[in-house]
Amino acid sequence: MSFNTFGHMFRVTTFGESHGVAIGCVVDGCPPLIPLTEADIQGDLDRRRPGQSRFTTQRQEADQVKIVSGVMAHPESGAQVTTGTPIALMIENTDQRSKDYSDIKDKYRPGHADFTYEAKYGIRDYRGGGRSSARETASRVAAGAIARKVITGMSVRGALVQIGPHKIDREKWDWDEIGNNPFFCPDKDAASVWEAYLDGIRKSGSSIGAVIEVIAEGVPAGLGAPIYAKLDGDIAAALMSINAVKGVEIGDGFATAALTGEENADEMRMGNHGPAFLSNHAGGILGGISTGQPVVARFAVKPTSSILSPRRTVDREGHDTDILTKGRHDPCVGIRAVPVGEAMVACVLADHLLRHRGQVG
């Protein structure tokens, strides 16, 4: 299986399967002399970790990260810093229940990658989906923590802005609310509605989709390159690579189809520090290059395909059959996708920052 690596100057390769011994990543291209400890990474992993509320999978994984290579004690200060060599990170799997999948090992789960993996490779890991499991995203979050150390001066924050038909009230957006509820929701009132709504979804054994918004602030103008290395193109590709993501938009995205040219164009005036934009419909990117405004991206995740209702499918022998999925699953995978989306945007920004330095100094 190829294509487990993304990025150009800041390159991330992830490895491991849902029910394997461990998962992890190798980050290549990180500059030297950046302070980096396991604690710097653990905080981000803890935000994504499963089993923290009744609204996420009850698989209990500590997600304790171990730095295997790429760091050493600074010869003068003694602080642990990056050396410029590949940084290998490993996270052990400790709570696999492969027996939960033995009854369906010869059946293709609707909505999952079972059929397509076997069609391509002639073999698939039925134990939790193997590489196609959202378990893989812990490695991305670990890499994103390193990326954040590269893009100093920039902040990348995400929020859940919609679950099913229920959206936040943007007038009530408060970043301080993110840590006060289990949804990464910036609207206190919406979080209360979601709690009752998702309880109903969870108890019925069903699932629901969601929309996540990621905002990067402090991004300097000039990141990205025209045509085939656009910043928004790479952000879109990075977010689309996350499990269950079915749509991405930058700025006002699809809503711009209903706007006139006068409404959509971000007008400009001279400000105290040079040209300033009067709006940000473009989401901080024009012509594939950052404008200096906040970079805004949203992505939609589908409902978790593993639900308790029996569904029609076929087996590996080509027979029609029914399937009932057991195991432990997220009723809304969008919740834990928030730190994953942040990580992917951080990695893309780190990559483009290093590419920008290499091209223009």
Curated annotation (Swiss-Prot):
Annotated InterPro entries: Chorismate_synth, Chorismate_synth_AroC_sf, Chorismate_synthase_CS
Needed co-factor(s): FMNH2
GO cellular component: cytosol
Co-factor binding comment: Reduced FMN (FMNH(2)).
Binding site for NADP(+): 48, 54
Record family assignment: Belongs to the chorismate synthase family.
Protein name per UniProt: Chorismate synthase
Classification of source organism: Bacteria, Pseudomonadati, Pseudomonadota, Alphaproteobacteria, Hyphomicrobiales
Gene for this chain: aroC
